[in-house]
Each structure stands twice: as structure tokens, then as C-alpha cells.
Amino acid sequence: MSILKIHAREIFDSRGNPTVEVDLYTSKGLFRAAVPSGASTGIYEALELRDNDKTRFMGKGVSKAVAHVNKTIAPALISKNISVVEQEKIDRLMLEMDGSENKSKFGANAILGVSLAVCKAGAAEKGVPLYRHIADLAGNPEVILPVPAFNVINGGSHAGNKLAMQEFMILPVGAESFKEAMRIGAEVYHNLKNVIKEKYGKDATNVGDEGGFAPNILENKEALELLKNAINKAGYSDKIVIGMDVAASEFYRDGKYDLDFKSPDDPSRYITPDQLADLYKSFVKNYPVVSIEDPFDQDDWAAWKKFTASVGIQVVGDDLTVTNPKRIAKAVDDKACNCLLLKVNQIGSVTESLQACKLAQSNGWGVMVSHRSGETEDTFIADLVVGLCTGQIKTGAPCRSERLAKYNQILRIEEELGSKARFAGRNFRNPRIN
């Protein structure tokens, strides 16, 4: 069934910044999608179009992107009469109309809003759940429920503390189901709150952009100690592993790294890529750290390559790969990492996100689906991770409704699948069904 009407508007994300929401109508009803936005963005990401009108929302308005949808994209898609099940055809048409390499004409936020809404409408047209429609688009006969990676301690550009590394995550890989993983995550989160309160006082339990705690600590090792303590107190040391998102591009300075980048600049304290790699190796040795994202700057290819070859853990590319097939192909050739972080708004369409995922998986990589720090109540990525069978998702702590919206949707999907539900568990890095 073809599109009857498309209407975009400005709404607000979880940080109080404007973002794009798209309503798409077919004869089956209304399908709504909202676009997320990142704080620590890779320089190679598709362009998120902001108005840059300083008199309005500090320049962060998205009225131009909204106008591109309402005045240009909507009339074109409606006149073409393409069925909403033809995701690739619709996405390709928008990409051709935009014509730029990085979606700078319309904005990735305009194109993605429509693309997500089309995908939801396509599922309804086929009379199947969204995750099943996505699985069909990706050519997956089965679906898999992911291990959640809960970001429970926040640092970096997501928090006002001195901690350089951006996310410290717990992954309940020993759970038997997604429901149990949620329970484990929530219980550890509450234990962590008490551990932090006892050590640093009540105001240290204020939460960051993604619902994790942001105690004012400087040493990254201290964050790992807090996690270890909370995991032990909750009684889950045999069921939980730790993941980190370092977001090292945020503190890369002239070929070196500044682990105290939120203090006044002092080049004498910068460390080399090799010294930073040794620090990571000490984390892996002393804590159950099994996944490190963006350990080095997005252009420090040599450091990535050397590190990935020297460790047996999951090394995740985010700023390095930005969900972009060209960057992923280079990272595959260079053996720079072994897992893709999949963020739909980095590339800007459902079709290209699916392509990026399949490219990574076909090269033996893991794939972790991810939210952004500026989120909405939209739950598309919950269905996406199940349909793509990636086995792992990070969408914040078990705190703040824009984070729980995704986790709760996966709970509903697990319930709906009943006895057919399969949880990735300890196989989260490569959960393919044979």
C-alpha cells in the first residue's frame, strides 16, 4: 500500500534539544518515528542538519530538516506511489534526491525519520511485527533476543565528572532470558547506587545523559572497582561481564591521549597509544572486561590494528566506522576492530543500516546495536536488534524512560515469541542460528 500523507515536526529529545519526528499515513493508519542525536559524534557521520539560528534553541533547531520532509520528500514519495514494503526503493529515492555523499542537502535526520516510519508502515502492511519485517529485509529466517549492555557509570562527554572514559557497562551474559538479564541489570544498578552513595555521598548518585551514575572520580580503574564491588554485592559475579566505551577521539591530542581532558590543558600528562593500550590490557587482566569500544581516535588506524591483533576481546568500532560501509570495508581490510557499533542515525537510512550490519557480519564481526545519548521514546532499535540477530544492544542504564522504552519493548517481544524466544547469552558476539 502506498503512502497517503507524510508530516514532520520538531519535537524534543531527552536532553531538551529539538529533533525530527515523522508521521506517515497509509490506509492501515498512522506510523510515527523520531530521530535520535549524539553528543560525542564521529567526524565521518552523516550530516545531522541543524538550523544554526542562534536566536532559536541555541542554533540547534531542526526546522530546515522538517521543511525538507514536508515540502520536498513527502510530495515526491506520495507522487511515486511506491508501496511501503519496498524499503530499499524508497530509501534509494531519497538518497538520489539528496545527491550528497553525507546527506547534507536534506540532513540525515530528515531522511532517517521518513525511513524509520516507512519501515514501521511496511510491517503493518505485511501484518507482521516490526522485528519480523526487519528480519525479512535482512534475509534472516529466525530472530534472536540480545544481551543488554547497561551503561551504569557515565564519564567522558556524557557527564560532568572528571572521568575520561565515556561508558562502563554491565552485560548479564549468564542470564537464561532477556527478562532475567533485565532483572540482573536492575539489581546490580541498585547495588551500585548504594556502593557509590556510601563511598562518595548522596550527590554522587546523580545520573548522566544515559541514566548511569556519574560520580566525580578521575581514575578509570576506580569505575571498574565500583562495578566489581556492586556485581559481587548483588551476587552475580558468575553471570556478568563488563564492557567499556572509551570514546577516545574525545581526548586525542596531537597523536597522544589526555586522560584528564576535562581539566586545564597540560601536554606533559599526555600518554602514547602504546601506553593507553597497556592500560586497557591491565583492565582486561584484572577485571572481567570483554568488550572495549573506540579505544583510540577515529583516525589512529595503526593503534587500532595493533591493539586488536594483541587482545582476544571484542574491539568495537563506533567513531572509527560510523555505520558507514566504506569505513567498515577499510576496517575489515586493516583488521582494525572485530565488532561494529550500529547507529541508524550515523548513516541515515534503514537500508544502509542493514547493509552495514550484513557487511560486518559477513566478515565475521560482531554487531552491537546502539542508541544515542540524545534519545526519544521511539523504540525502533529494540525491534531492529531482534530482527538483525546481532545478539547485543546498548541503550543506557535501567533508568530514564527514553532508555527503558527500548528495553521494555524487547521484554514484550520476548513474551510474544514465547517458546520460540532465543536469548543470545554468552554467544552475544556471534549468535547466528545455523
Swiss-Prot record:
It is an enzyme of class 4 (lyase). The keyword Magnesium applies. Belongs to the enolase family. This is Alpha-enolase. NCBIfam families: eno. Mg(2+) 2 binds at residues 245, 293, 318. It is found in: Cytoplasm. It comes from Alligator mississippiensis (American alligator). Pathway: Carbohydrate degradation; glycolysis; pyruvate from D-glyceraldehyde 3-phosphate: step 4/5. GO terms for cellular component: phosphopyruvate hydratase complex. InterPro entries: Enolase (IPR000941), Enolase-like_C_sf (IPR036849), Enolase-like_N (IPR029017), Enolase_C (IPR020810), Enolase_CS (IPR020809), Enolase_N (IPR020811). Substrate binds at residues 158, 167, 293, 318, 370-373, 394. The active site is at residues 210, 343. Homodimer. Binds two Mg(2+) per subunit. Required for catalysis and for stabilizing the dimer. One of its GO terms (biological process) is glycolytic process. Mg(2+) 1 binds at residue 40. PANTHER family: ALPHA-ENOLASE, ENOLASE. Its EC number is 4.2.1.11. Its cofactor is Mg(2+). Keywords: Cytoplasm, Glycolysis, Lyase, Magnesium, Metal-binding. Its main location: cytoplasm. Pfam families: Enolase_C, Enolase_N. CDD domains: enolase (cd03313). One of its GO terms (molecular function) is magnesium ion binding. It catalyses: (2R)-2-phosphoglycerate = phosphoenolpyruvate + H2O.
